[in-house]
Amino acid sequence: MSVDAETKTKIIKDNARDKNDTGSPEVQVAILTTRIKNLTEHFKDHHKDNHSRRGLLQMVNKRRSLLAYLKKKDVERYNALIQKLGLRK
């Protein structure tokens, strides 16, 4: 459900805009996407875990708002991120 430190470091390194960037929308969306994928796998075995499902919905909504912000501010960065993470078809 959570992302371990080395995976998070790799995600930050892959999506950061510069070497000290840890909070840009790109990094936040990439981390949320990884957490969402992990929780989705969790629900294949634990379909009655409604407590975690609420957290999943919160993460999806947070990612949606970050993507909307990024699209409003810089469409090119938004399109590059969507392509890189494979979120939209």
Swiss-Prot record:
- Function (record text): One of the primary rRNA binding proteins, it binds directly to 16S rRNA where it helps nucleate assembly of the platform of the 30S subunit by binding and bridging several RNA helices of the 16S rRNA.
Q: Which UniProt keywords apply?
A: Ribonucleoprotein, Ribosomal protein, RNA-binding, rRNA-binding
Family indicated by similarity: Belongs to the universal ribosomal protein uS15 family.
Q: Which GO terms describe its molecular function?
A: rRNA binding; structural constituent of ribosome
Q: What Gene Ontology cellular-component terms does the record carry?
A: cytosolic small ribosomal subunit
Which PROSITE patterns does the record match to this protein? RIBOSOMAL_S15 (PS00362)
Q: What protein name applies here?
A: Small ribosomal subunit protein uS15
Subunit comment = Part of the 30S ribosomal subunit. Forms a bridge to the 50S subunit in the 70S ribosome, contacting the 23S rRNA.
Give the superkingdom in one word: Bacteria
Q: Which PANTHER family match?
A: RIBOSOMAL PROTEIN S15, BACTERIAL AND ORGANELLAR (PTHR23321), SMALL RIBOSOMAL SUBUNIT PROTEIN US15M (PTHR23321:SF26)
Q: Which parts of the sequence are annotated with region: Disordered?
A: 1-26
Tell whether Ribosomal protein is among the UniProt keywords: yes
Q: In what ranges is there compositional bias, type Basic and acidic residues? A: 1-21
* GO terms of biological process kind: translation
Name the Pfam families on file. Answer: Ribosomal_S15
